[in-house]
A protein has these predicted regions:
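A conserved beta-strand element that flanks and buttresses the S-adenosyl-L-methionine
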Residues: 181
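Class I (Rossmann-like) S-adenosyl-L-methionine-dependent methyltransferase catalytic domain
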Residues: 2-12, 16, 20-24, 28, ...
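Short catalytic micro-motifs in class I SAM-dependent methyltransferases
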Residues: 184-185
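Gly/Ala-rich phosphate-binding loop of Rossmann-like dinucleotide-binding domains
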Residues: 112, 116
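A short glycine-rich, Lys/Arg-flanked "PGG" loop and its adjoining helix->strand segment in the class I
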Residues: 195-207
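Helix-capping/helix-break motifs at membrane-protein junctions
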Residues: 190-191
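Conserved beta-strand/loop positions that form the S-adenosyl-L-methionine
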Residues: 100
């Protein structure tokens, strides 16, 4: 006797659609707390796979406020800058290093395996969340890694800040560091603030000390890409020394005229040794996303 099942067949597309419907229904039936626990578990497994013993120093994806929210990109960003520190900046294991805008440790992680006990790493940031996170994870394991929050005003990142950037003196003595790093800091600062910070960098650097600072630089090439719509950032609002993506909140992202930046360096006595242009504006040949300016204190 036939049950009529011989004609009930599914093609691959139908089977796939049915499977997706079942999975969608299953997800709807799982309570939210269980979903969150599963997500945390999978996230921790992924961290362990990517970072090994350093996994406790890596924030959750939703905590990565200082760049792309992806574990793979967090790892890639850190490794990329670590190579730049060594190959371009000549960073040695026993140096005194200042990281202005240290974030949540994106560029700090590889340094824990490179800087020795004679080295000193000082990081500061306007974001208290990142500073507290790094203090808890890094400083407890590596006593020569220090982090502090600076209560400096920034319209985008710290609108309630107590001090104006032009008033803030870095909390270090003159010639305290042989290497200073600023990643994606001057891309969020107005001209007067940038000039003051650059002077402070010069002050805290030793003679012959180096600094690496990232920018969005305006020159003939980048302007051509911007005006043709190829740039990843729509720097449409033009001012005397810079362009920005927002007239109301220019600190959201600022690109400076390369010539103006070069003049600031010359005026202070910072000799630009190398300039590597980034991919941000749509150029095809680049080293990193932002433009990198490497200079030495004369």
């Amino acid at each position: 006797m036939s049950l009529g099942l011989e004609c009930v067949t599914e093609n691959p597309a139908q089977r796939g659609a049915r499977k997706r419907r079942v999975m969608k229904l299953a997800k709807r039936l799982v309570p939210l707390p269980v979903k969150l626990r599963i997500k945390d578990y999978l996230g921790e497994r992924k961290k362990a796979r990517l970072f090994g013993a350093l996994a406790p120093l890596v924030p959750r994806v939703n905590e990565m406020y200082d760049g792309p929210q992806s574990m793979e990109e967090f790892k890639q960003n850190g490794e990329e800058f670590f190579e730049i520190y060594k190959t371009i900046c000549g960073l040695e294991p026993d140096e005194r290093m200042l990281d202005v805008g240290s974030g949540i440790g994106r560029k700090t992680l590889p340094l824990t395996q490179y800087l020795n006990e004679r080295a000193v790493y000082e990081g500061f940031d306007v974001n208290k969340v990142g500073v507290d996170w790094c203090r808890e994870r890094y400083s407890s394991r590596f006593p020569n890694f220090h982090f502090r929050q600076i209560d400096v005003y920034n319209k985008t990142y710290n609108p309630l800040g107590k001090y104006q950037p032009t008033e803030y003196r870095f909390p270090f003595e003159a010639e305290s560091f042989s290497f200073v790093m600023l990643g994606s800091v001057f891309t969020h600062m107005l001209p007067d603030d940038l000039e003051h910070y650059l002077a402070e960098i010069y002050r805290v650097l030793t003679r012959g000390g180096r600094c690496l600072i990232t920018y969005f630089l305006l020159n003939d090439e980048s302007l051509k890409h911007i005006d043709s719509g190829e740039s990843t950032l729509d720097m449409r609002y033009a001012f005397e020394k810079y362009r920005t993506i927002s007239r109301e909140t220019p600190e959201s992202a600022i690109a400076y005229q390369e010539g103006w930046i070069r003049e600031r360096y010359r005026g202070l006595g910072l000799k630009i040794m190398r300039l590597d242009y980034g991919s941000w504006c749509g150029r095809q040949n680049y080293l990193s996303y932002q433009d990198l300016v490497f200079a030495v204190k004369e």
